[in-house]
Amino acid sequence: MNVAVQSRVDRETIGVARKTKAYVALTKPRVIELLLVTTAPVMILAQGGWPNPWLILGVLVGGTLSAGSANAFNCYIDRDIDRVMKRTQRRPLVTGELTDREALVFAWIIGVASIIWLGVISNWLAAALSLAAILFYVFVYTLWLKRRTPQNIVWGGAAGCMPVLIGWAAVTGDISWAPVILFMIVFLWTPPHYWPLSMKYRDDYASVNVPMLAVVRGRAAVGLQTILYSWATLACSLLLIPVAGMGLVYTLAALAGGGWFVYETHRLYDLAVRHEPIKPMRVFHASISYLSLLFLAVGIDPLLPF
């Protein structure tokens, strides 16, 4: 492993505002935003209309704490490789804005708080799913899969699918086929979302011996896999139509958004096999827009009379 030289801050000069900002950064808020995009629409679908606004707000708060805890544990565990990878050298455990102990205590506090909070404001099934998401992300993905297999993001990505189950369970108190399909949509979407990012930062991952698919197989193999998973995502999204009785808005969003996503993955692969310059982040950003559009339609469709 290469050793990067770090510029660590003097902890005695860190004020309250900067310390607070460091704690927020530890939770990876941009990742949390993407996770929460799926939660509220699923709650609307589960209710068949608007749930209690306070329930939506409460579940979003609980989901933020849960995901933040998992991400904070991840930062603590991966602090050794974060000090080497260029894209992670501004994280608070690398810069010294937070100590290892502060990060670990914080992760435990907000994790426990998320479980209790969700149990109290919704139900204990939602709380149990929150606990399962944290444990899976920390132990299965971060500690077991991430540094061992190129399929790390495939199976580890299951933790990022849990918000749809949590949102559904918070409203209905159970799990049916509709949330399972929604779970699978996010599960199948995750690899073609994340693998292009790993293509851009291939050298970063290689420098710390993390066997991302782009590191061990190359960009053509990544391009082909993104195609396969994007088609699977599109097909799975269409299954929701008969299962949940989705209407015209969702159907159009699934077809148009899914078709666009598939096109972008094909374009990435075509450029890769021709050894032409590629822009993997184009697929990365397209995947975010696609998922946001799809789940926006999930939330809008039950509110319409047609």
UniProtKB/Swiss-Prot annotation:
Membrane topology: Multi-pass membrane protein
Localization, UniProt: Cell membrane
Principal location class: membrane
A molecular function (GO) term: protoheme IX farnesyltransferase activity
Superkingdom, natural source: Bacteria
E.C. number(s) listed in UniProt: 2.5.1.141
Pathway it works in: Porphyrin-containing compound metabolism; heme O biosynthesis; heme O from protoheme: step 1/1
Primary enzyme class: transferase
One cellular component term from this protein's GO annotations in UniProt: plasma membrane
CDD domains in alphabetical order: PT_UbiA_Cox10 (cd13957)
Transmembrane segments: 31-50, 55-77, 104-124, 125-145, 168-188, 218-235, 238-258, 286-306
Regions annotated as coiled coil: none
One GO-annotated biological process of the protein: heme O biosynthetic process
Catalytic activity annotation: heme b + (2E,6E)-farnesyl diphosphate + H2O = Fe(II)-heme o + diphosphate
Keywords of the record: Cell membrane, Heme biosynthesis, Membrane, Transferase, Transmembrane, Transmembrane helix
Pfam family, one: UbiA
Its job: Converts heme B (protoheme IX) to heme O by substitution of the vinyl group on carbon 2 of heme B porphyrin ring with a hydroxyethyl farnesyl side group.
Further information: Carbon 2 of the heme B porphyrin ring is defined according to the Fischer nomenclature.
Sequence similarity: Belongs to the UbiA prenyltransferase family. Protoheme IX farnesyltransferase subfamily.
Protein name: Protoheme IX farnesyltransferase
Protein species of origin: Clavibacter sepedonicus
